[in-house]
């Protein structure tokens, strides 16, 4: 499968599964799991999967703790993200998402537990007009001692953020064949 920058043989993988249940036209429940293999340092092969061109924000929690920034102290533990979410479509123009993520390492690390922490993400979207959407969200994360070691920081401090975004996507070229 090639070699990494340290000339180690790479043997890594990613697996993803998502299931959704549409209750009615307004409510949908979603469950998903993403597994990115990690390296525990006990092999002659490097087993940590590299997303390379990531979509971290979309899949691994809105707070971008994973794969938008590197792991610290030489760790490459991979990631196991289990998500449970609900979507409420209030109207044709307004929808809301609430997602819970539980993060753990994919690889067993010496003297550390696998649990990294949990995150809750809330987002509301409003289609103001044809090409304009207003979105807002709020997220918070509770990390563990393992998170402190592999990512840095202090798991006892409250971690949260809120945001507002205006997305303008005009159709600039339309060709009909």
Where are these regions (language model features)?
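Outer-membrane beta-barrel transmembrane domain signature
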Residues: 74-81, 85-119, 127
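Extracellular/periplasmic loop regions
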Residues: 1-89, 95, 149
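Outer-membrane beta-barrel "beta-signal"
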Residues: 66, 157-177
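Hydrophobic, lipid-facing positions within transmembrane beta-strands of outer-membrane proteins
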Residues: 13-17, 80-84, 118-122, 160-168
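Flexible, surface-exposed loop regions and adjacent strand-edge segments
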Residues: 46-52, 114-117, 151-157
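Repeated loop/turn-to-beta-strand initiation elements of outer-membrane beta-barrel proteins
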Residues: 26-29, 92-98, 126, 130-136, ...
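C-terminal beta-signal and adjacent terminal beta-strands/loops
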Residues: 130-157, 170-174
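Transmembrane beta-strands of outer-membrane beta-barrel pores
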Residues: 1-3, 33-39, 100-106, 140-144, ...
């Amino acid at each position: 499968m090639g070699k990494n920058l340290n000339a180690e043989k790479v043997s890594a993988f990613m697996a993803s599964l998502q299931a959704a249940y549409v209750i009615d036209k307004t409510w949908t429940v979603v469950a998903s799991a993403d597994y990115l293999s990690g390296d525990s340092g006990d092999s002659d092969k490097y087993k940590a999967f590299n997303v390379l061109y990531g979509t971290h924000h979309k899949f691994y929690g809105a707070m971008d703790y994973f794969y938008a920034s590197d792991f610290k102290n030489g760790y490459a533990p991979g990631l196991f993200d289990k998500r449970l979410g609900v979507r409420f479509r209030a109207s044709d123009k307004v929808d809301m998402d609430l997602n819970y993520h539980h993060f753990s390492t994919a690889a067993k690390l010496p003297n550390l537990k696998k649990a990294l922490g949990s995150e809750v993400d809330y987002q509301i979207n409003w289609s103001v007009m044809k090409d304009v959407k207003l979105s807002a969200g709020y997220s918070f994360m509770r990390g563990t001692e393992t998170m402190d070691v592999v990512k840095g920081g202090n798991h006892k401090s409250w971690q949260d953020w809120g945001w507002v975004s205006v997305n303008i996507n005009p159709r600039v070229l339309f060709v009909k064949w």
